[in-house]
Structure formats: structure tokens, C-alpha cells
């Protein structure tokens, strides 16, 4: 499988464990920093799009103009039935593209917090080998509604 990561903060590196996992499984991995005006590959060159976290909010196109082509890319990937995984800010972008509502009125979670898998999350290959409840580092103050037709796989106290 050809995985491609969309990155949002030029000074942050994606979880090297994620990249190592993908490579160990025999997947090709690419990365694009849209915030550095890098161009992503054509959709026919990727199978799985991973939209990573970042500090912007989904409504800040004026401050981060690269959000406009990123949102267009996500919409095209959905139309072409690409596998898309959104993490943190990436999940907000994906939820918005699918008709969910992103808002800034949820409690901030900054620091180490528990994540709980839902029943669907426990069955998902994405969480194979992961405990039903685990602790990970959070840094977010925005949240989103799960769009119609989508399935929540995990949640924290604030989400």
C-alpha cells in the first residue's frame, strides 16, 4: 500500500512509530508539508491518505491559505474512495469534509490523557494490539461531531 501523510507544522515531525510501522508492514510512505507549499502527489499515486495534526483551526483559511487546497484534496480523495485517516487536526478536517461540525467550545486537553476505544475501535485493524484504554499525549481545544454515516473508533474525556 502507498501511504501519504499530510503535515501541518513545519517544525513537527510525524510520529516516527507510525512511519516505522508502515514501513515494517511493507508500505511505501510519503510526506507533504502543505504549510511549506509542497505539492502532494496525484491521487492515483496513493492508496491511503493520513491527515496529521497541527496548530491551525479548520476555519483559519485567511491565516493559513494552504488549507484551501488541502480541503480540496481531501474532498477529491473522498470522491475517489481513498482510505483516509485523520489524526487530531486531520480528523477535524476530515469531519468537516464529511459534513460534521468543528467547534472551539470543547474543553482543552493538554497533557497526558486516557483514550478509550469504542466497540468498533476494538474491532478495527487500526487498533490491533492496542489496549481498550491507553494514555497518550493530547494538545487540542477544538472538537467535532461525528458525521452521519461515520463511526467513532476512540474517544477521550473531552471528545
Predicted regions, residues:
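Short loop/helix-cap segments at secondary-structure boundaries that form the rim of catalytic
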Residues: 39-44, 93-95, 145-149
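Cysteine-nucleophile active-site neighborhood
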Residues: 52-124
Amino acid at each position: 500500500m502507498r501511504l501519504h501523510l499530510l503535515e501541518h507544522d513545519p517544525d513537527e515531525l510525524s510520529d516516527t512509530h507510525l512511519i516505522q510501522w508502515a514501513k515494517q508492514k511493507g508500505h511505501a510512505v510519503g510526506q507533504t508539508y502543505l504549510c511549506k507549499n509542497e505539492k502532494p502527489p496525484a491521487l492515483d499515486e496513493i492508496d491511503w491518505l493520513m491527515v496529521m495534526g497541527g496548530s491551525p483551526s479548520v476555519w483559519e483559511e485567511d491565516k493559513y491559505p494552504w488549507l484551501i487546497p488541502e480541503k480540496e484534496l481531501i474532498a477529491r480523495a473522498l470522491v475517489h474512495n481513498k482510505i483516509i485517516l485523520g489524526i487530531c487536526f486531520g480528523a477535524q478536517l476530515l469531519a468537516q469534509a464529511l459534513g460534521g461540525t468543528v467547534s472551539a467550545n470543547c474543553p482543552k486537553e493538554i497533557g497526558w490523557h486516557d483514550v478509550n476505544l469504542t466497540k468498533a475501535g476494538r474491532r478495527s485493524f487500526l487498533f490491533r494490539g492496542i489496549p481498550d484504554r491507553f494514555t497518550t499525549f493530547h494538545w487540542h481545544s477544538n472538537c467535532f461531531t461525528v458525521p452521519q454515516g461515520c463511526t467513532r473508533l476512540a474517544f477521550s474525556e473531552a471528545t
